[in-house]
Amino acid sequence: YPFKTGEEYVWFIAIEDKEVVGFVPVEQKSRKKAVINNYYVKAEGTVREEILSHLLPAIVAEFRPESWLLNSVTLVQDKGTFEKFEFVSMDKKWTRYVKMYR
């Protein structure tokens, strides 16, 4: 996937039958802040929610709230799934995305 990446990124990848079905790059910023942006899930509806529901707990475990502020630029269609993992909407909203934090 054509993303710029480096040592400051941690990638969480969902694989099914040797095929990548989703990924979430998390950029580690200064002062224990991490940002989810440009994630991809190769599904819609309940399958999409299921894939994200496998990826998000791994991210939350890696970036624990006691140590990290975790922000996300979340697709509006995924907002409910992120809320299940205690992400909260911020005031910032675009047409297709909403900024969230945990």
What is each residue range found by the language model?
Residues 74-94:
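Conserved active-site alpha-helix within GNAT-family acetyltransferase domains
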Residues 15-17, 99-102:
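Active-site beta-strand termini and strand-to-loop segments that position acidic
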Residues 61-74:
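Conserved GNAT acetyl-CoA-binding A-motif
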Residues 32-44, 95:
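Conserved acetyl-CoA binding element of GNAT-fold acetyltransferases
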Residues 1-11:
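Active-site rim helix/loop that mediates acceptor-substrate recognition in acyltransferases
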Residues 46-61:
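Conserved acetyl-CoA-binding loop-helix of GNAT-fold acetyltransferases
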Residues 13, 18-27, 35:
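Conserved beta-strand in the GNAT
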